[in-house]
């Protein structure tokens, strides 16, 4: 303990991981941060090992993945772990954001913390998309073609940007090299943002389920919350082991086991499951440019929440109306997952348009309007109490 407090580097670690005071009433919903940290470490480690055996060449990429699976000792475990932890990474980050939305963790003084988190989410999606292309299977090729083509909707410079990304006039060897290089380096940028996120959290500490200051009732991180985190970490490793060993392709796409063929178009071109809600928003708008704007806007709109939430109460646990709208939003978001996996035909297109409308209405209309109504009712109730006194 003396070493932890005297050494310059270890003293910093001690202040963040050992002596850091946490609210006494934190629930298991606050465990997603530690799970995400474990996922990031696993992804970087397994990714580095996979990169040692992968060949970023259009004619050899698919075979090099098969080489990892068949010839490299325990290569199949490393690859399936990397692929499935990526899915868990997004499951945990969606749950982490959902908890932040429910308990209003984006409100002052944690605006910087929330903003860095949104940037992390956008970067994660970019890294996930790049990784989806790297095996250069059939869905990798056509997914890359469709998604990168979206940038052609940008006026004047769109097509030039697409060809710059491709390194030619179609997805080719140059594209694969670009994507592999970015997929390798961006996780380290992500790790730097996670450190910044952690530092921003350390300034004001964690929010808590009651939404009020908890400075008078806090416990140190170790041993109380470290052991609490270990419960969910061990549960995660158990579930991950079951999936890796028994259902490794549960969250993957079977078309990616077919080598990339630019002459054969898959029956349905879809991105990885964790991008489906935003893909559904993109397809629900007929105009290409507006669809791209809506897709990116559906992510960046999270940044405006600290401005649009006008309620004086932190968290939805004491707000019945907002609690109803929040769970309706969750159901709507799950529906967008489903719609993103369907063909853009009737009735999926119309349902997608309704779901997209509600998605944006939640942030721009429902959240501020509900806050104003609650504030007005609160003021009227206070005045009535004053008159009665």
Curated annotation (Swiss-Prot):
Keywords: Electron transport, Heme, Iron, Membrane, Metal-binding, Mitochondrion, Mitochondrion inner membrane, Respiratory chain, Transmembrane, Transmembrane helix, Transport, Ubiquinone. Heme b b562 binds at residues 82, 183. Gene3D superfamilies: Cytochrome Bc1 Complex, Chain C. Binds 2 heme b groups non-covalently. Pfam families: Cytochrom_B_C, Cytochrome_B. Belongs to the cytochrome b family. PANTHER family: CYTOCHROME B. This is Cytochrome b. It comes from Strobilurus tenacellus.
């Amino acid at each position: 303990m003396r070493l932890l407090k005297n050494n310059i580097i270890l003293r910093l670690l001690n202040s963040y991981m050992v002596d850091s005071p946490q609210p006494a009433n934190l629930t298991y919903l606050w465990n997603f941060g530690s799970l995400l940290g474990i996922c990031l470490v696993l992804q970087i480690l397994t990714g580095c090992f996979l990169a040692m055996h992968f060949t970023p060449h259009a004619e050899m990429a698919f075979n090099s993945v098969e080489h990892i699976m068949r010839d490299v000792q325990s290569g199949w475990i490393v690859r399936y772990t990397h692929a499935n932890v990526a899915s868990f990474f997004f499951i945990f980050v969606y749950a982490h954001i959902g908890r932040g939305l429910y308990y209003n963790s984006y409100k002052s003084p944690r605006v910087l913390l929330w903003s860095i988190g949104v940037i992390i989410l956008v970067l994660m999606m970019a890294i996930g998309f790049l990784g989806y292309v790297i095996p250069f299977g059939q869905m990798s090729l056509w997914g890359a073609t469709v998604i990168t083509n979206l940038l052609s909707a940008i006026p004047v410079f769109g097509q030039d940007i697409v060809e710059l990304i491709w390194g030619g006039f179609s997805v080719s060897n140059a594209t694969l090299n670009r994507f592999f290089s970015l997929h390798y380096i961006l996780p380290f940028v992500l790790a730097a943002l996670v450190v910044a996120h952690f530092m921003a959290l350390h300034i004001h500490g964690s929010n808590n389920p009651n939404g009020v200051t908890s400075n008078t009732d806090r416990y140190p991180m170790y041993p109380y919350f470290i052991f609490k985190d270990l419960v969910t970490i061990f549960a995660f490793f158990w579930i991950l082991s079951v999936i890796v060993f028994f259902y490794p392709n549960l969250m993957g796409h079977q078309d990616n086991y077919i080598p990339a063929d630019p002459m054969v178009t898959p029956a349905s071109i879809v991105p990885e499951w964790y991008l489906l809600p935003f893909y559904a928003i993109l397809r629900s708008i007929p105009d290409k440019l507006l669809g791209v704007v809506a897709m990116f806007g559906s992510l960046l709109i999270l940044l405006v929440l600290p401005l649009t939430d006008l309620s004086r109460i932190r968290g939805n646990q004491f707000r019945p109306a907002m609690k109803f709208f929040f769970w309706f939003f969750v159901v709507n978001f799950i529906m967008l997952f489903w719609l993103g996996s369907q063909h853009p035909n009737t009735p999926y297109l119309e349902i997608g348009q309704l779901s997209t409308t509600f998605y944006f209405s939640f942030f721009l209309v429902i959240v501020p309007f509900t806050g104003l109504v609650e504030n007005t009712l609160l003021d009227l109730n206070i005045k009535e109490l004053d008159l009665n006194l």
